[in-house]
A protein has these predicted regions:
Chain B
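Alpha4 helix (beta4-alpha4-beta5 surface) of REC/receiver domains from two-component response regulators
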Residues: 68, 89-104, 114-117
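Receiver (REC) domain switch/active-site region of two-component response regulators
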Residues: 111, 120
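Two-component/phosphorelay signaling modules centered on CheY-like receiver
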Residues: 10-33
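Active-site beta3 strand of CheY-like receiver
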Residues: 49-56
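Acidic catalytic/metal-coordinating carboxylates
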Residues: 36-39, 65-68
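A Lys-centered signature of the CheY-like receiver
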Residues: 8, 108
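Receiver (REC) domain active-site loop signature in two-component systems and cognate sites
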Residues: 61
Length: 434, 122
């Protein structure tokens, strides 16, 4: 035993310890003789979790905390003991014990403890009672911890749920704004392409109207002539001419009508119904509209236009104004590309844009090919992305192909793909299921 | 008198033939038609003797334009009169036509009385 503590004092202390309450005097003495004492400053560890448990401790003076990391299970002071559990089960220490203030402990090592236990088995009851107390206390602490954690967790869940709900409504707002912006952008793109078209449309309407005017005026003159004539052969000739003229008037009137319809269709907000459409006719009309639109904005522009239309192309159910936008966009791009290449000024270059239709595997294919500048491999992935444009700022919205892609793949469950070799050609392939 | 009309609209043939019915019937005028600048070039090349007096060409045609044809004609057959026709009567087009040697510029819709005068003044 340590020198600083008297033997009698130690016996007094041990007597107070619940564990040794009814131990006979000689055994208390025997135990006291084998005991060593040790002092710990505040904050010093007496037991570390995981240590081998080969002794138990009785607090002679001071105060300690029993803890697992930062989690304090209990604080105990003089007259109490700790460390008996590891002693009994031989397992490593399950908790750490640290002095809270200056503390003196009596150390009872394993052999001495078991000797006492052998000589006086009655203290087993004390040990069990004590263990039960410890376990209960520990249990209570754990339950309390668990409850408070559960509450914390519930509060956290509630808080997070609220935050999420807030975020969600913010996002809904953002989404609404985005939808609005998207609609505006789509409208802008429509207007931009319509603006580009205006000149083409004017030209395309003016031409048939000129024919209508000319042929009707001529017919009036022919009628006047007819009235004067008596010769039957001459009269028959005039009647044939008149019939031809009326047919021309009718054809050109229809042509102008169809162009105006297309134009209105193109700018109108989409109606919800798909309609059966003749894609050959639409391709042809928009090819010419695009051509005249390009020409009107660019008097030097010209290109060969080739059409290879499949004769028995089935009509397809489509949102016709959407498809017309796709066609117009592809034709505009093609003509832009051939014009760009033409401006390089290579001798013998013949700008050409062609459109070919066919039926493959129950799908209608529209191929728009140009022999313009081509698309570099590195750009092929990007051209369908919104706002991607290679045109000088202000010339393109960067939405044409991305909208076209959405129209074909989403609204029509089709495919839009591209093949291109720089300096040779570009081919866009629209595939729409019949 | 022989005139070559160049336009990508096929119906111009019937229109012109009727407009100039009387003159054609009376043998005062003969009309030929070409529906692209390239067509017109081969028509001109195949003509012998070159008895055409006037080429009347649209400007805006797919492929080679009326300006290409004008340039070609003036280089190869400088004596030929070329009158340009366009739906766009802007100064740019007109100046360009006259600098390339066109002897006239008509804006669509064509005033046929004026065209007749032009043809018979040659």
């Amino acid at each position: 035993m340590s020198n600083s503590i008297s033997f009698d004092f130690l016996i007094k202390v041990l007597r107070k310890v619940f564990l040794f309450q009814n131990l006979p005097d000689h055994l208390v003495k025997q135990l006291s003789e084998s005991i060593t004492t040790q002092e710990f400053e505040a904050g010093k560890a007496i037991i570390e979790k995981g240590d081998e448990g080969n002794a138990m401790f009785v607090i002679i003076s001071g105060k300690v905390k029993i803890h697992d990391g930062n989690e304090v299970v209990a604080e105990i002071n003089e007259g109490n003991f700790f460390g008996e559990m590891a002693l009994l089960d031989g397992e490593p220490r399950s908790m750490s014990v640290t002095a809270i203030e200056h503390t003196v402990v009596a150390i009872i090592n394993r052999n001495d403890f078991f000797n006492v236990l052998n000589d006086f088995p009655a203290i087993s009851k004390n040990i069990i009672t004590q263990l039960t107390r410890h376990l209960r206390a520990q249990n209570d602490v754990l339950i309390a911890q668990w409850r408070s954690r559960e509450k914390e967790l519930n509060d956290l869940v509630e808080k997070r749920t609220e935050e999420l709900a807030n975020k969600n409504s913010e996002l809904m707002l953002v989404l609404d704004n985005l939808k609005l912006s998207q609609q505006q952008l789509v409208q802008q793109e429509k207007l931009a392409s319509l603006g580009q078209l205006t000149a083409g449309i004017a030209h395309e309407i003016k031409n048939p109207l000129n024919f209508v005017n000319n042929f009707s005026q001529l017919s009036l003159e022919l009628l006047e002539e007819f009235k004067e004539l008596t010769d039957e052969t001459e009269r028959a000739e005039i009647l044939t001419d008149l019939k031809n003229n009326l047919e021309k008037i009718n054809n050109h009137g229809k042509r102008a009508d169809s162009i105006v319809k297309n134009m209105l269709n193109h700018s109108r907000t989409r109606n919800d119904d798909k309609q059966l459409a003749d894609l050959n006719k639409m391709s042809d009309e928009f090819l010419h509209l695009a051509y005249h639109g390009m020409f009107a904005n660019n008097p030097d522009f010209s290109c060969y236009m080739k059409t290879n239309f499949a004769e028995k192309l089935p009509k397809v159910n489509v949102f016709s104004q959407d498809i017309s936008r796709v066609l117009l966009n592809l034709f505009n791009n093609a003509m832009y590309a051939v014009n760009k290449r033409k401006k390089l000024g290579v001798m013998g270059y013949e700008p050409s844009v062609s459109v070919t239709t066919s039926t493959v595997n129950n799908c209608v294919l529209i191929e728009v090919e140009d022999n313009g500048t081509g698309i570099p491999e590195t750009m092929k992935d990007k051209i369908f992305e919104p706002f991607f444009t290679t045109k000088p700022s202000g010339e393109g919205t960067g939405l044409g192909l991305s909208l076209s892609y959405d129209i074909i793949t989403q609204s029509h469950k089709g495919k839009l793909s591209v093949e291109s070799v720089v300096g040779q050609y570009t081919k866009f392939i629209i595939q729409i299921p019949v | 008198m022989k005139v070559l009309i160049v336009d990508d609209e096929l119906d111009v043939e019937q229109l012109y033939r009727q407009r100039f019915r009387k003159e054609i019937k009376a043998g005062e005028l003969e009309m030929m038609f070409a529906f692209s600048a390239t067509d017109a070039m081969s028509v001109l090349a195949e003509l012998a003797p070159m008895d055409i007096v006037l080429v009347l060409s649209d400007i805006n045609m797919p492929g080679l334009t009326g300006f290409d044809l004008l340039k070609f004609t003036k280089e190869k057959y400088p004596h030929l009169n070329v009158v340009m026709v366009s739906a766009y009567g802007d100064a740019d087009n007109m100046n360009r036509a006259s600098s390339l040697g066109a002897s006239g510029f008509l804006v669509k819709p064509i005033d046929f009385t004026l065209l007749k005068e032009k043809i018979f003044s040659i």
